[in-house]
From Swiss-Prot:
Designated name of the protein: Calcium-transporting ATPase CtpE
Cited NCBIfam families: ATPase_P-type
Bilayer topology: Multi-pass membrane protein
Keywords associated with the record: ATP-binding, Calcium, Calcium transport, Cell membrane, Ion transport, Magnesium, Membrane, Metal-binding, Nucleotide-binding, Phosphoprotein, Translocase, Transmembrane, Transmembrane helix, Transport
Name of encoding gene: ctpE
Length: 797
């Protein structure tokens, strides 16, 4: 075993106590995430809940509990949001790159396992195969020590460590043994710095969520004047009892609020989470489903994302010196079987040649980083070595030049050769005779090519980035259909604009540092791209966090899984197209649902304003002010089959239409004109049917019923338009919705319960006629809007 001059028996108890007192222990400071109280407050005290809460109190003041059922939406909206964010908090709080590793710490009082927070500066920590490096340090003892730093650097190959070399927290031992002295502990360690940066709380960007918030803000501004006007006119200008006035006022205010829009959006996201969960895809933030459907650039980390761990033998080229009785396949199988601690290359050979001939081993020389070869002497089959061609061959030989040519393609090349002396001889391997070149390549995930082809069809560009060498990265990219020269990231410009321009010219990048991965994401975003980052290592954490959507592999580091919005638990890259599909379903369906809810808001506000203005005009003219046409029960049944049930079904329906930006603009350009038509048509019918202050209860009920008929006809036509292009299930949604109202108006018990009276043939005829005109106007508007947006109007799919 090689020892450095700094190797010691470890610290004394007094030295340990002194370092703890000086704060030089591995106590990592608690990460800052939102508290449960902050999450609760953020989800309870929202704009939509404030609106609903005030209206609920008004309804309860009338004593009509049945009309206050919409208050349950306050609970539903809050609970769904809190559950999702608390789950995200719990995931972040569990972020621990070094996991539950128990390092073997050597001190003068003895060598034993300790928890990671007991480690102090200058502690000596022993390492063996599979052990994790828990703090940064310097190697003081080594015996063929090889460290896997792929989760930190992206470098696929294990790194041989000699005395004096540095090791970083988050890496682990592949083979050999050794010890290192802790040089950086606590928040100074490399992994701890990344963890602190990664654990800051963020929410994924969501055009749907932001758009709905903007719409709700706009609605709030409309509600204030419309609400105040309605309250004044219904309470102080009409000449009916206070309870009737309050009910009419509530009937005006309640439908102004798109009370189910936020809930339907949350349900649509939640159903997507469940569906993707069945595909072993964990969605840690609901809007991430939407986000991936909007992505136009995917930055894919090569190691662990596009490739699997390990190598595979892709070719064996026999050389001129192969005239021996032993077959190359038998020799390779025998070498693999004789290796007690195979590295990645020998494991690949063992997988390819898994039928060893059963030769008797006379001597064995394990692989050493210093010699770059391993070998076995067999009793009756000679001496065989396998290792680096540049070490075993004369650089001027034909075999060496052939190996160099193959290696330039990003492939790993090993030389199989026969030695002239036993492998345990002091002069081993002696004179070697080249027998074969064993060519290995990284294992590419079998589903990677199909997934990248899918993104290409969807016009989503893919950038392959890795800490591995550029030639190797380019070779993998080429096998996946991403052709073009790979660039060494050490030559990348540092300026954001220059970097963004360079990214447009190249597809593959090697030797990319963690901070460069982050810079690549920022540069792409600065040019207006929506960026997804896939990765599995600690070196991917910062880029995963800053990307619009972070996607981690389930087998990756705890840090990468914690900061990613989407985790592929089964490590299947091919799951991503299904996530895109779910995102499209949510985006397309919520746009339809938003049209329904906002159309209701527009016609409700307009109707309240028209009634209120009429009341204000009537006062100086000494005319009877209008009562609002509807009581809460009327607006409740109106919402059942024009919005509520259809919206729920539409929000969950299949939909693979491509997502485009401009959610708010598209919704407003349909909801506002449709709502105006419904509001005006309903008001015209009500004016024609209204009999004034001295009308009987039956006449007032008939006028309200007439207005409701017009509203239902036009609102149902909006549903019919929004449901296009038609499929059988959409027709099965629209037609029964209309039939449901026919049934309600036909049943005496329903008419009595819901305060409906369509017995006045004159007012009912007016309502039907105005309803037909309103529906025709909505149809014409739909065709005109489609032309204006440059969308081909489709009635049938």
């Amino acid at each position: 075993m090689t020892r450095s001059a700094s190797a010691t028996a470890g610290l004394t108890d007094a030295e340990v106590a002194q370092r703890v007192a000086e704060g030089k222990s591995n106590d990592i400071p608690e990460r800052v995430t939102r508290t449960v109280g902050q999450i609760v407050r953020a989800n309870v005290f929202t704009r939509i809940n404030a609106i609903l809460g005030v209206l609920l109190l008004i309804v309860l003041a009338t004593g009509s509990l049945i009309n206050g059922m919409f208050g349950l939406l306050i609970i539903a909206n809050s609970v769904i949001g809190m559950v999702q964010e608390i789950r995200a908090k719990q995931t972040l709080d569990k972020l621990a790159i070094i996991g539950q590793a128990k390092p073997l710490v050597r001190r003068q009082s003895g060598t034993r396992t300790r928890s990671t927070n007991e480690v102090v500066l200058d502690d000596i920590i022993e390492l063996g195969p599979g052990d994790q490096v828990v703090v940064d340090g310097e190697v003081v003892e080594e015996e063929n020590l090889e460290i896997d730093e792929s989760l930190l650097t992206g470098e696929a190959d294990p790194i041989a460590k000699d005395a004096g070399d540095t090791v970083m927290s988050g890496s682990f031992v592949v083979s050999g043994a050794g010890a290192y002295r802790a040089t950086k502990v606590g928040s100074e360690a490399y992994a701890a710095k990344l963890a602190a940066e990664a654990s800051k709380f963020t929410l994924v960007k969501s055009e749907l969520r932001n758009g709905i918030n903007r719409i709700l803000q706009f609605i709030t501004y409309l509600l204030v004047p419309a609400g105040l006007l309605t309250i004044y006119t219904q309470l102080f200008t009409t000449h009916v009892g206070w309870r009737e006035s309050v009910l009419r006022m509530v009937g005006a205010l309640v439908p102004m609020v798109p009370e189910g829009l936020v809930l339907m959006t949350s349900i649509a996201f939640a159903v997507g989470v469940v569906r993707l969960g069945q595909r072993q895809c964990l969605v840690q933030e609901l809007p991430a489903i939407e986000g991936l459907a909007r992505v136009d650039v995917v930055c894919a980390d090569k190691t662990g994302t596009l490739t699997e761990s390990g190598m595979r033998v892709c070719e064996v080229e026999e050389l001129d010196g192969a005239g021996r009785q032993e077959s190359v396949a038998d020799v390779l199988a025998a070498l693999a079987a004789a290796d007690a601690r195979p590295n990645a290359s020998m494991q690949a050979i063992a997988e390819a040649f898994h039928s060893p001939p059963g030769w008797v081993v006379a001597a064995n020389a394990p692989f050493k980083s210093a010699t770059k070869w391993s070998g076995v002497s067999f009793r009756d089959h000679g001496n065989w070595v396998i290792g680096a061609p540049d070490v075993l061959l004369d650089p001027a030989s034909v075999a060496a030049r052939q190996a160099e040519r193959i290696g330039a393609q990003g492939l790993r090349v090993l030389l199989l050769a026969a030695g002239s002396v036993a492998v345990d001889h002091a002069q081993a391997p002696g004179q070697v005779t080249p027998v074969a070149l064993v060519v290995l390549e990284q294992k590419v995930r079998p589903d990677a090519r199909e997934t990248l082809d899918y993104f290409a069809v969807q016009n989503v560009s893919v950038k392959v980035i890795s800490g591995d060498n550029a030639v190797s990265v380019g070779a993998v990219a080429d096998r996946l259909g991403l052709h073009g020269e790979a660039m060494d990231a050490r030559a990348l410009p540092t300026g954001r604009e220059e970097l963004a321009d360079t990214l447009d010219s190249y597809t593959s990048f090697g030797r990319v540092r963690p901070d460069q991965k982050r810079a690549i994401v920022h540069a792409l975003q600065s040019h207006g791209h929506t960026v997804a980052m896939t990765g599995d290592g600690v070196n991917d954490v910062l880029a995963l966090k800053d990307a619009d959507i972070g996607v981690a592999m389930g087998s990756g580091s705890p840090a990468s899984r914690a900061v990613a919005q989407i985790v592929l638990l089964n490590n299947r890259f091919a799951t991503l197209p299904h996530v895109v599909g779910e995102g499209r379903r949510v985006i397309g369906n919520i746009e339809r649902v938003a049209n329904l809810f906002l159309t209701k808001t527009v016609y409700s506000v307009l109707l309240a304003l028209l009634v209120g203005i009429e009341c204000l005009i009537a006062i100086p003219l000494r005319r009877d002010p209008l009562l609002f046409p509807f009581q809460p029960i009327h607006v409740t049944i109106a919402a059942w089959f024009t919005i509520g049930i259809p919206a729920f079904i539409l929000s969950l329906a299949p939909n693979n239409e491509r997502a485009y930006p401009g959610f708010v603009r598209r919704v407003m350009t349909s909801a506002v004109p449709f709502g105006l038509v419904i509001g005006v048509a309903t008001f015209v019918t009500y004016l024609a049917a209204y009999q004034g202050r001295y009308a009987s209860w039956q006449e007032q009920e008939q006028a309200s019923t007439a207005a409701l008929i017009t509203l239902l006809m036009t609102a149902l036509w909006v549903l019919a338009v929004i449901a296009r292009p038609y499929q059988w299930w959409r027709l099965a949604l629209v037609l029964p919705s209309g039939l449901a109202y026919v049934v309600i108006f036909s049943l005496p018990l329903a008419r009595e319960k819901f305060l409906l009276d369509a017995s006045n043939l004159a007012t009912t005829s007016i309502a039907l006629a105005v309803g037909v005109v309103g529906a025709a106007t909505i149809e014409a508007m739909w065709w005109i809007r489609s032309r204006m947006l440059g969308v081909k109007p489709r009635v049938w799919r």
